Amino acid sequence: MGQPAPYAEGPIQGGDAGELCKCDFLVSISIPQTRSDIPAGARRSSMGPRSLDTCWGRGPERHVHRLECNGVIFTHRNLCLPGGKTKTENEEKTAQLNISKESESHRLIVEGLLMDVPQHPDFKDRLEKSQLHDTGNKTKIGDCTDLTVQDHESSTTEREEIARKLEESSVSTHLITKQGFAKEQVFYKCGECGSYYNPHSDFHLHQRVHTNEKPYTCKECGKTFRYNSKLSRHQKIHTGEKPYSCEECGQAFSQNSHLLQHQKLHGGQRPYECTDCGKTFSYNSKLIRHQRIHTGEKPFKCKECGKAFSCSYDCIIHERIHNGEKPYECKECGKSLSSNSVLIQHQRIHTGEKPYECKECGKAFHRSSVFLQHQRFHTGEQLYKCNECWKTFSCSSRFIVHQRIHNGEKPYECQECGKTFSQKITLVQHQRVHTGEKPYECKECGKAFRWNASFIQHQKWHTRKKLINGTGLSAVKPYCPCAILSPLPPQHTCSALAPPGPPLSSSHAVVLPPSVPFFLLLPSSEKANPSPVQIAHFFQDLAFPGKSSLQSPNPLSHSL
């Protein structure tokens, strides 16, 4: 910073003749808006911006020295003596001190003896250490908000009163004498969030949070980071380096902080408790995330669609849906995934690992979320309730999909034809119409299908065919569906199913055993339908009575 030219002002106290005096002033200035803005326990710092000013003049005379630092204008008036000396407190009892600040223009004017104005937090202790420049004598100063001190007496009462007024002041100014560079606290306030940082390098790094600047890039996966230290920690994921090992269980970690958190699990320490529900946590970060459930706070928003999240990691993973980023690749099948946790779950498909087992029925699961949903079937717990129809759900994803029935939301759009869908799986199935993909192939005949439901129905056809061609056909009486499994008498007409035409006799009905679907084949009227046979109804999973003789002389007269 340049050194602004000093200037002299006011009457000459001892005439215009005399020796040339020289006074040096080193100034460091920082002005936060209010004293309460400075956080307690803030870190100490070396000196912030400084300005050195030199007074040249013939003394003794009263000089007004003008300095400027970071847009703050500082004027100091002192009685200068020949040889660069100043009058002390005892020699100049009538010296006046007047400090004022205009908050809008950040203009600070100090008039009086050069002094230290301590910033934070121990004003009383720091006030007693204030020094006159170029002397060893201490002086006490007044309030920094338009206060005039007529006499600087060293009484205890005055010192306490001055310290109290300083605490109420909103001025944060540092003046350092040429006798030494005392360590002062200089805080830099963020204009975006209002938080203070010290030193200036921390303030500069903090600004990347608001600008979203991430200058450090991982060469392996392309992930970017704000800080070089976080990049170094991230690279250990790719190298597999885990230098920190737990002495209890031998589990290794890439970061020492993760090891310390893990060790709390062995000790059973859960020092962080939720004041709303009483739930305890091993880590403060988990408590903070948990409390957002009660407050409903979702501070992290997707820049593409505006969707809000309570956890920053969930927001990052969600944004990869828009940009298509999938940095994690499965070494078994080459599939790319959006997060490391999803990759771990996917790998269990290849390994067959199912670490989550239900104690009620013994069923095991790959993923914890599916396991928790399954447990709700046993407990009957329904966490999610629709306000429109009062239907309840045990799974949040099903609840969200259900709500789209009422609001008509269809967020998934086909890029080929523009058709929209309420569920992503429906969109995936629809896209197979355009791509021609048929992922479900029958091992019996090689026929392929676009949809899983059609594939399952096709497989049942092979099962029925095997039963008919083999010995699996049970000799049971035909039954009428409208009579609720009552025996079908000769010449019985089914009013519910039979179309207009000839009455249905038992010789036209075929009933398969309980292990396969049940269906009736009815002769159709030539006027109603030119087809020789009409499928009237289709039943699945019906229970049938015991074996009896088949009424039809030729049960397979209608070919399947």
Swiss-Prot record:
Keyword annotations of the record: DNA-binding, Metal-binding, Nucleus, Repeat, Transcription, Transcription regulation, Zinc, Zinc-finger
Compartments, record wording: Nucleus
Top-rank lineage group of the source organism: Eukaryota
InterPro entries: Znf_C2H2_sf, Znf_C2H2_type
Recorded family membership: Belongs to the krueppel C2H2-type zinc-finger protein family.
Keyword Metal-binding belongs to the record: yes
Name used for this protein in its record: Zinc finger protein 619
Stored SUPFAM superfamilies: beta-beta-alpha zinc fingers
Organism the protein comes from: Homo sapiens
Gene: ZNF619
Gene Ontology terms describing biological process: regulation of transcription by RNA polymerase II
GO molecular function: DNA-binding transcription factor activity, RNA polymerase II-specific; RNA polymerase II transcription regulatory region sequence-specific DNA binding; zinc ion binding
One cellular component (GO) term of this entry: nucleus
Zinc fingers classed as C2H2-type: ranges: 188-210, 216-238, 244-266, 272-294, 300-322, 328-350, 356-378, 384-406, 412-434, 440-462
PANTHER family: C2H2-TYPE DOMAIN-CONTAINING PROTEIN-RELATED, KRUEPPEL-LIKE TRANSCRIPTION FACTOR
Its biological purpose: May be involved in transcriptional regulation.
Transcription regulation found in the keyword field: yes
